[in-house]
Structure formats: structure tokens, C-alpha cells
């Protein structure tokens, strides 16, 4: 059986919290920000949790987290 490895791209994007939820950054805030309202950009600040439907995929990419 081959060695299990962490997907490094996923390790840079996700953080597993002690309770088991996975934290991720918000999308749509890197560029083309001039046409977005201040309120919209403000709501994109901070991190949010990965949705339940994507959780198994993310955990499979992070076997040691």
C-alpha cells in the first residue's frame, strides 16, 4: 500500500479546528474589487466554515489534520 500524503494545495487553504470543522478563506476578494461595494467587500472579510457537502472531500485531502 502506498504512503498516505497530504495534498499541499489543500493544506495551504484549509485549517482544521479542534471541534472537527474546517475553516476556509472567502472567495471573490483578490482582484476586480473596484466594482464591488464596500459592504460586499466587508462581508467577504474573515474566514468561514467548509460546507457539510464538501467536508468529506477536504478531509480526504488532509489525512493527518
Swiss-Prot record:
The keyword Repeat does not apply. Keywords: Ribonucleoprotein, Ribosomal protein. It comes from Paraburkholderia phymatum (strain DSM 17167 / CIP 108236 / LMG 21445 / STM815) (Burkholderia phymatum). The lineage of its organism: Bacteria, Pseudomonadati, Pseudomonadota, Betaproteobacteria, Burkholderiales. This is Large ribosomal subunit protein bL35. NCBIfam families: rpmI_bact. Belongs to the bacterial ribosomal protein bL35 family. The keyword Ribosomal protein applies. One of its GO terms (molecular function) is structural constituent of ribosome. It holds the Pfam family Ribosomal_L35p. SUPFAM superfamilies: L35p-like. Signal peptide: none annotated. GO terms for biological process: translation. The gene is rpmI. It comes from the Bacteria. PROSITE patterns: RIBOSOMAL_L35. GO terms for cellular component: cytosolic large ribosomal subunit.
